[in-house]
Amino acid sequence: MASSSGDDFVILVCTNLNPIEVEVEKDREILISTDDIQSWDLVTILRYQTVRIRAYRNRLTEQSSYFHGLLGGSFSESSLDNIVVQWNLETFLNILQCIYGCPLNVALNNFLPLFEGALYFGVEMLLEKCRAWFSEVFLSKNSGPPQIQCDDLIHMWNFGLENANDFVPELCARYLARNFMWAMSNRDFVNIPFNLLFECVKHPCLTVDSEMHLSDALLVWLDANTEQMDCSIRTKENLTGILKEIRISILPLWFAAGKRRSCYFSKLADESVDSILRLVKIPPTGSINALGDVDLNHLRIRLTEYSEKVDFSSRPQVTSAILLLSVLHSSHSMDSTLRKIIKKYLINLEHPDKDHWRISECLPPALSFEALQEVNISKCHRLHLEYAIECFSRSFPSLKIIKAAYLLNIKTTSFIKLVHKCPLVSEVDLSVDISPIIPTQVSVLSSNPALPLVSNKCWDVTSCYHSGTSLSNITYLTIEGRTDICDSDLEFISKYCVSLGYLNIKGCIAVTDVGISNVICRCIELHSIVVCDTSFGMNSILALCCAAPKFGNSTGHFGKRASNLQKLHMGCCKGVDETSLIELMSQTAMLKSLCLSDTHLVDEALYNFSGSSLETLDVSNTMISGAALAHIIRGNSGLKHLHARGCKYLFQQGSYIGGTEFSFSHPCKDLFFELGRTCKLEGIALGWGFSNFSLEALKPAIISLKSIAVGLGGTLGEDALRLLPTTCPMLELVILHFQVLLINKRYFVDPYDFEPICKHIGRLFIAMGD
């Protein structure tokens, strides 16, 4: 029907290809008008097969280039009253709402349809709205999980390419680059198109914890895609070219050496090993000049405005020069003058008496990375720690966690003083390997209860709250295995780190029971203590069982310190007698993790345990009975990890109490019954009394099991091993101690016998000893 000159509206006829399946009018058609657009009920409208929309021509031609050309041009449709629109009905209704000024929310679920519709119909207002939403989401600096999922990102990238829109692909590459650590753990990571991945890796916003993470991710992608695509040799070379974006000079040496057999990475691995060894030979103060006039970008640790964590642990090639290079802007020309200034500055760092601050004023200003919260410099033995902390304080103002494990070139107390320059740091890890130095039994020093405790001095801490003394914010301190730690160091820690909540001094064999008790008394916020293989003894137990004082204007006392404990690991602490353990267990109602292995633990202590929140329990190599263990399991249904290897009395009626040994009797069936009835275990370690029949009773409890260890006195035969992957579908680790395995009528010696099992289990260890 032709339009008369007096008519200023047109009927838009839309066919709904996917109407909502409900009863509607027999003609399945509805007429609506843009006059009522504010009150449109889309749910009702979308039930109809055909929707006729009465819309004004002028508004359509003003806001849509498509309708401007169609209705205002020389097309035959321009004179018609009815125009057929073939488009997704819901999307088209949303486009009309935007044209007529109705509020419209762009979201992840409708962005692509709206953007595509806005492009097709030429609605600039909607295009701007889509661009604004896309930019806000993709450029947002908000922390937390990404709003866009990996598969959605892939769809958006493909859409941008198909519609020749550079705006979308560019932001997709940037978004993937800044969220690369999240993307690489996503199951859709291997489905990312090569061009998107390549643009992401080249993008200056590429954010990774380390080059090792980037390398692993790219190798996983290549493994998945080159096999599926059955690529030619030339195509494979193009694909592996992406690996050249990896900064191979700052990979860990062990990682690079381990990749020499990779079909994609072997050549780069050799180059990486050579480069690392060359860097290690260069003195720390001369690492920049010795490299000549080459581009130094490959030595920069990857830092961006989105970096939250950086890990350059186990890299002996990392020095102060490389750290300095990484926090300077890449636009700075590394000419001979700047190189000389850097060299002089680094040399002066080795001589504290020299005024290196005056030289530092000649250095270009360092960048600030506001989002970075965690740094790992463990095993970086050639890194000047004083400069490193100074650098962190300037360039990482939000730093909260410093991991500096396996570094022996600085005293613990000195490092804690240095960390004070980073005011927000709350967690410090200075642990070292303890296995070579822990004796079979730690000698207990000063464990006589008659010796004076610090409890009468703990009020001195009050002055710290009101004086001008500058205190550390450290709440989480790990100094495991530090043999340089003595009582005076613990006293410094207790005075300086008054907010300490977590303390790990495992293997600190030079500290005494009195020294440990002083820390417990002073640090009233302690909720987690790891004191395995130390002189933790009677004084420390007394300190835990004493009431903690209140400070400030408050009066009275807090509850006893033990009542606040959530984690207590005191394995191999022989200085605690049975009576003290019984008293301690009666006061630890909040415990979630408890380790009492190799202690004088007896049944009465477990019967006196007042808690119901245990998630981890280790009673290995103790004298407890199965009945006592069943009792504690019965009251702690949330138990996830149980270690009871080496408990010889586990299947007797009782244990050693007061020097009396109970005679052997029938096995305690209650234990496995309670485990199967009460718990959902993730890890278990058992020995004496454990058998294939025990595994059957445990079935309900081990559906989610991830690790199992069987020790001396227990048996786990071939049949049970073969059933493990079925019984425990999530199992990752199996450890067998002192197990005699008879397979095919011969003693097990051939590793290929276990090949079918290892296909389903991540790791299998067979230990001949403890």
Residue positions per predicted region:
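N-terminal BTB/POZ boundary and linker segment
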Residues: 1-58, 90, 97-108
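Short active-site loop/helix that positions an aromatic residue
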Residues: 61-71
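A structural signal for leucine-rich repeat
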Residues: 322-331, 363-367, 389-395, 415-422, ...
